Amino acid sequence: MDVIKKKHWWQSDQLKWSVIGLLGLLVGYLVVLMYVQGEYLFAIMTLILSSAGLYIFANRKTYAWRYVYPGLAGMGLFVLFPLVCTIAIAFTNYSSTNQLTFERAQQVLMDRSYQAGKTYNFGLYPTGDEWQLALTDGETGKHYLSDAFSFGGEQKLQLKETDALPGGERANLRIITQNRLALNQITAVLPDESKVIMSSLRQFSGTRPLYTLADDGLLTNNQSGVKYRPNNDSGYYQSINADGSWGDEKLSPGYTVTIGAKNFTRVFTDEGIQKPFFAIFVWTVVFSVLTVVLTVAVGMVLACLVQWEALKGKAIYRVLLILPYAVPSFISILIFKGLFNQSFGEINMMLSALFGIKPAWFSDPNTARAMVIIVNTWLGYPYMMILCMGLLKAIPDDLYEASAMDGAGPFQNFFKITLPLLIKPLTPLMIASFAFNFNNFVLIQLLTNGGPDRLGTTTPAGYTDLLVSYTYRIAFEGGGGQDFGLAAAIATLIFLLVGALAIVNLKATRMKFD
């Protein structure tokens, strides 16, 4: 006898396909909206991920993929997609001065205007809940008055000549300032059909478009007569000389263009970028290597000590030594920043009392780097200590008993037995720690902000800057503008360098993953 399983209403196929259909419509709407807004990469990414997700969760044959899809989607969205965007930006001139599309930059220039013709003093006079606009010609003394109107939106006011201004009290400067946005949307039309708009808090004046666009793309300044053409190599409207060559003047804002590998070329050819880049790269490698070596050394030694059988109160020592790992790193970094203060820090007070010295932790390059390594070692050793404590449990006690019979001491046991047996399983974690510290942005940003600064560079760079913080400063702290394209190029190089170093380290260790 066949048993018929009763389905609940939420298990029905109609409900499932209805939900899938609604999700599909919502995704389609979002994709179209992104496409209309010009966000093509986001539209493509959303379409791919959502289509794959709907197919996998709607098809019974792809049931196993339902467990894999969230991880793959997360990796694609948060790893691959930003990587592709960064590499794409690296081949453009995208910056704080070249953010717009060509059409948008052209429209911004065409919207600019300049004062032309007469200037009129204006006043606002209340008429109940409405206002009247009055203009006065300073040269002839003639007055012009509008009908009553209310603020709101763009509007044209037809003004008529009048012998005298209204008798009410004229609006003061505070009221005009409060309604400035509304007044900027008013166009006053005089009896001779000339138009004037608000040019200051007390004046209306005639305006003309600053630029005129020809059919061939030539832009002419109506005030100075200078002509401009779009230069697709630099991403600006640039002046042209009488012989047709490019002039020196560029119109801002610029627009984004593809410039090929120029950003990468700048890194290796521009001395103002090249010198700090290679110096910062060397320091980044040294910092990462020293951090890994010191954290492993300190963590391993402390792990051996707290595992020592003769030591009393081991649990208390373990808790105390792991505490730096429990405190959020940004809090510890800011505390150390205060402790290392050159004038009032406790560390300098102690060194001055004991040895009569006050190191310049934040102004001298060498001591600043030493401080960074000290703080990072403090932050990183608890992690390595926890790992070593676990790995020490896997070492057989028979090895130490045999070495004791041969007369070996603690140091011989450590270097002949403990270290060789711990270093191999630690190697992948050491490589991961190296990669993490290679991009340890939080430490540098909060502790030194990259300082002390280097002199004679065209980009902001400091002696404690890592490549990642150097990239950040180029992108967001550049005095000559935020150069996102150059920062993206350096970020791409960092990705390649970290990947190459990780591969070299793995091959150098000749590890076998069985």
Swiss-Prot record:
PROSITE patterns reported in the protein's UniProt record: ABC_TM1
Positions on the Periplasmic side per record topology: 37-39, 93-283, 342-369, 436-483
MF annotations from Gene Ontology: ABC-type maltose transporter activity
Protein's UniProt keywords contain Membrane: yes
Domain ABC transmembrane type-1, chain residue ranges per copy: 281-505
NCBIfam families, per database record: PRK10999.1
Name assigned to this protein: Maltose/maltodextrin transport system permease protein MalF
